[in-house]
Amino acid sequence: ADAAPTVSIFPPSMEQLTSGGATVVCFVNNFYPRDISVKWKIDGSEQRDGVLDSVTDQDSKDSTYSMSSTLSLTKVEYERHNLYTCEVVHKTSSSPVVKSFNRNEC
């Protein structure tokens, strides 16, 4: 059966920012079928550089897939912008599933 993904977004940790890096992660869990697309936007503009997607094997219990999409930036790049958005397109929804956060509210 088709399963709609659960999407969550996580800002970089304070520890990571202290060391000069910034990784934003979008978790997309328990979806089926496997065909899925994740798009990153920074302040509304699509960001393709520094993105790494990793899909897990099918879950043995419910046959769904999960994936993480990681956006890697430097701390300087990260602090230059405010709105970070992860958009997930899957056949279970006619419109993208969108999760975002404002850096100045973290």
Swiss-Prot record:
Gene3D superfamilies, alphabetized: Immunoglobulins
Write out the entry's keywords from A to Z: Disulfide bond, Immunoglobulin domain
Under the heading PANTHER family, the entry gives: TAPASIN
Organism name: Rattus norvegicus (Rat)
Q: What's a GO cellular component annotated to this UniProt protein?
A: alpha-beta T cell receptor complex
Q: Where does the Ig-like domain lie?
A: 5-102
Q: What is this protein called?
A: Ig kappa chain C region, A allele
Disulfide pairings? C26-C86
